[in-house]
UniProtKB/Swiss-Prot annotation:
Keywords: Calcium, Cell projection, Cytoplasmic vesicle, Disulfide bond, Glycoprotein, Hydrolase, Lipid degradation, Lipid metabolism, Membrane, Metal-binding, Secreted, Signal. The gene is PNLIPRP2. CDD domains: Pancreat_lipase_like, PLAT_PL. This is Pancreatic lipase-related protein 2. One of its GO terms (cellular component) is neuron projection. Lipase that primarily hydrolyzes triglycerides and galactosylglycerides. In neonates, may play a major role in pancreatic digestion of dietary fats such as milk fat globules enriched in long-chain triglycerides. Hydrolyzes short-, medium- and long-chain fatty acyls in triglycerides without apparent positional specificity. Can completely deacylate triacylglycerols. When the liver matures and bile salt synthesis increases, likely functions mainly as a galactolipase and monoacylglycerol lipase. Residues 93-105, 257-279 are annotated as: Required for galactolipase activity. One of its GO terms (molecular function) is phospholipase activity. Disulfide bonds join C21-C27, C109-C120, C256-C280, C304-C315, C318-C323, C453-C469. Ca(2+) binds at E206, R209, D211, D214. It is a peripheral membrane protein.
């Protein structure tokens, strides 16, 4: 992938005509800002709809496993299908060197059917996506125009308004969705950008890339947003939505540091393994979204100016107005989806369903002597127990307090007790004892505080249990 577009961007191109038209989808210019700018020096036209050969594959709750193919220029195929006018319609759009008739797009539809009645349309434009990157960039314009034409037809012929439509696009698919939204004057109900493509889009004018004006609500998940040079990142860095989420800082995702062999020999197959090695962080965006459908509370985004401030605890807990949920339910952030450029940060798990719940833990120490070591806390709640998390490492002094935010991989529910452990891994002939006299735990979402107390002190590596004060 990378050599084709990086080398291609350096090539000189022959000046061509100013536009090409593909009826009934409109005309496409090869003038600025579409080409001839710093990010797009090549003059290219998009391929024709016939060459791209995009397919629109409808899945519904009535046919979750076998699609019904829709002809977007013949709405009789919609009337003859399981498409329901009283349901929301979500389009799922893949990106570069991907396809839409299997894999994550169809899996996304199936998860939606578990929580809602919905028309789910996978847009398979693989013929236009499996080519040189710069050509695929321009091909998105035609597929975007096709989607816009289809949505407009649903509105004029079936009375199905564009506000009922949600476009979900990964990588180039997100920029493709933006083109559809732009052509509809921003009347689409929602666009979700899953790590929108960076090359040929970062820093371009608004009409070229995803922008808040493309839909009534635009939410974005950034997972591979470091700079192209030297990191070869694929996702856009700039804020391009109403709500922009940067999980784990938005640059490198946990669990994406595996070695080459273990990644390529992936349990999901060789091709999936190769994709995960080349673009692991880039792919996490749709994996997070997919998991959020069934785990809505495990992806809470905290409003913050930077990831560094978030990590230092400066943006905890959620403000009085609450925090949005990254992913499928981001539009439930009531009354706060119209302001543009809002940034949110969170940490995720490294595997499994990637969920995480943030807690602030404060520990006040008890004992008679100062020692060096580390202290750890485990939470025990109505929904389950957490593993032990390190709160502090260094000089442990009686009566000193230490506070740290932890990201727990399950929602423990109402915290009922905590367990404290300390160690220094050094032989000490005096067998010092240390304990926690008070532990305070605060949940990030509801801001509830739980207080636990004890008069005990323990030798190292011995668990101390604290109960509500």
């Amino acid at each position: 992938m990378l050599p084709s577009w990086t080398i291609g961007l350096l090539l000189l191109a022959t000046v061509r005509g100013k536009e090409i038209c593909y009826e009934p989808f409109g005309c496409f210019s090869d003038e600025k800002p579409w080409t001839g700018i710093l990010q797009r020096p090549l003059k290219l036209f998009p391929w024709s709809p016939e060459d791209i050969d995009a397919h629109f594959l409808l899945y519904t709750n009535e046919n979750p496993n076998n699609y019904q193919r829709i002809n977007i220029t013949d709405l009789a195929t919609v009337r003859a299908s399981n498409f329901q006018l009283d349901r929301k319609t979500r389009f799922v759009i893949h990106g570069f060197i991907d396809d839409g008739d299997s894999g994550w797009p169809t899996d996304l539809c199936k998860k939606m059917f578990k929580v809602e009645k919905v028309n789910c349309i996978c847009v398979d434009w693989e013929h236009g996506a499996w080519t040189k990157y710069t050509q695929a960039v321009h091909n998105t314009r035609v597929v975007g125009a096709e989607i816009a034409f289809f949505i407009q037809g649903l509105s004029t012929e079936l009375g199905y308004g564009p506000e009922n439509v949600h476009l979900i696009g990964h990588s180039l698919g997100a920029q493709l969705a933006a083109e559809a939204g732009r052509r509809l004057g921003g009347q689409v109900g929602r666009i979700t950008g899953l790590d929108p493509a960076q090359p040929c889009f970062e820093g371009t004018p608004e009409e070229v890339r995803l922008d808040p004006s493309d839909a009534m609500f635009v939410d974005v998940i950034h997972t591979d947003s470091a700079s192209i040079i030297p990191f070869l990142s694929l996702g856009i860095r700039q804020k391009v939505g109403h709500l922009d989420f940067y999980p784990n800082g938005g640059k490198e995702m946990p669990g994406c540091q595996k070695n080459i062999l273990s990644t390529i020999i992936d349990i999901n197959g060789i091709w999936q393994g190769i994709q995960d090695f080349v673009a692991c962080s880039h792919l996490r965006s749709y994996k997070y979204y997919s998991s959020s459908i069934l785990n809505p509370d495990g992806f809470l985004g905290y409003p913050c100016a930077s990831y560094e401030e978030f990590q230092e605890g400066g943006c905890f807990p959620c403000p009085a107005g609450g925090c949005p949920k990254m992913g499928h339910y981001a539009d439930q952030f009531q009354g706060k989806t119209s302001a543009v450029g809002q940034t949110f940060f969170l940490n995720t798990g490294s595997s499994g369903n990637f969920t995480s719940w943030r807690y602030r833990v404060s520990v006040t120490l008890a004992g008679t002597k100062k020692v060096r070591g580390s202290i750890r806390i485990a939470l025990y709640g109505s929904n389950g127990n957490s593993k032990q998390y390190q709160i502090f490492k260094g000089s442990l002094q009686p009566n000193a307090s230490h506070t740290h935010d932890i990201d727990v991989d399950l929602n423990v529910g109402k915290v009922q007790k905590v367990k404290f452990l300390w160690n220094n891994n050094v032989i000490n002939l005096f067998w010092p004892k240390l304990g926690a006299s008070r532990v305070t735990v605060q949940g990030g979402e509801d801001r509830t505080e739980y207080n636990f107390c004890s008069n005990d002190t323990m030798r190292e590596n011995a668990l101390q249990t604290l109960y509500p004060c």
